[in-house]
Amino acid sequence: EAEKKFKGFIDLVVYSKKDEKIHLIDWKTCSWGWKPQKKSDKIMAYQLVYYKHFYARKYEVDPKDIDCHFVLLKRTAKPGKKAEFVRVTAAKKRTTDALNALTKALHNINKENYIKNRIACTNCKDRFGTCEFYQTKHCL
């Protein structure tokens, strides 16, 4: 398979003397916050898992010394509650799972085997207009 290169942008990297850890931060804007399902969504978390894995590899840092967080920037929240930290754990098992998912995705892309997101398709039937491919020749 062909070699692939990725470019990612970590919004903020902070070293804390207090806990002697590097904190990788990704800003997310939202109106009010996230529901618990979104906070625990593994695919969403994989973004930070990849950041941690590749940051540790590039800078030769022990992954145990890196913590990851989404910071929700809430547009409609009350003053003093406009930001919320959502910690994302990225232990060995989750990192292995994320890297396996990436390998599988790259394999399918290289084979031009594009997999339909049937969850989004099911939802779009109830909310007409949210999927640009709904009821077209591209909707399988």
PLM ranges: what are they?
Residues D41, H53-L140:
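Metal-dependent nuclease catalytic regions and adjoining charged, substrate-binding loops involved
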Residues E1-L48:
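Non-catalytic protein-protein interaction segments used by genome-maintenance enzymes to assemble
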